[in-house]
A protein has these predicted regions:
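Carbohydrate-binding surfaces of carbohydrate-active enzymes
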Residues: 1-179, 184-192
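Short, charged beta-turn/beta-strand-edge "cap" motif at the junction between a beta-strand
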Residues: 195-196
């Protein structure tokens, strides 16, 4: 699609966001608007398991919500055992006006199985409140190590890292990354594969 790849064949960020949202195993939230600032909201959380990966297996879906200072506003964990439902409503996240009063809100959803994070997705809202506010948020540091086509990214800072991505200047039209524009918590590492040696 031309919307995900530009004229020169360079993959746009939206490609990676769509890739996450159409994964066969995903935890998702539904929003009826993108500006939640200073409003009471109830947001439904769903587990999508197209291939029944979690069938008869215990799992957790952890939801973490952060404000523009990257302080935790709320967390909630849904515990379950996989079944034959492809779409399963896990519950609702209720936030009051004080919790949503922020120029940015970030929602991070993790699926945990056998104490291992097997999926992560994140959303951001309230960006219309003060356009450009994301550039004044707390910063962190990322360490990158590369061996062949394996790249390890580590957040060595004190704040979450949002939208971490790999670029290879002069070869962007050839680059494909297994996962890009990711969320990394402090001291967390992620191993990615790239198609370039």
């Amino acid at each position: 699609s031309w919307s995900c790849v530009d004229y020169y064949g360079i993959i746009k960020p939206v490609h990676y966001f769509v890739q996450k949202s159409f994964a066969p195993l995903a935890a998702v939230m539904l929003f009826d608007r993108s500006n939640l600032a200073s409003q009471e909201v109830s947001l439904p959380v769903y587990l999508l398991d197209d291939c029944q990966t979690l069938e008869k297996e215990p799992y957790q879906v952890k939801v973490s919500i952060y404000n523009a200072l990257l302080d935790t506003v709320a967390t909630h964990t849904f515990n379950g055992i996989g079944d034959d439902n492809v779409v399963k409503k896990l519950g609702e996240i209720n936030l009051n006006r004080e919790q949503t009063k922020s120029t940015m809100l970030f929602f991070v959803l993790d699926i945990i199985k056998d104490n291992k994070n097997i999926y992560r997705n994140y959303y951001f809202t309230n960006y219309e409140v003060r356009p450009g506010s994301i550039v004044s948020m707390p910063q962190t540091e990322i360490k990158m190590e590369r061996t062949g086509n394996i790249v390890t990214l580590t957040n060595t800072g004190k704040h979450p890292a949002i939208g971490v991505h790999v670029e290879v200047p002069e070869k962007m039209d050839q680059l494909i990354v297994s996962e890009n524009y990711i969320w990394l918590n402090p001291q967390e590492s992620k191993i990615l594969k790239i198609n370039l040696e």
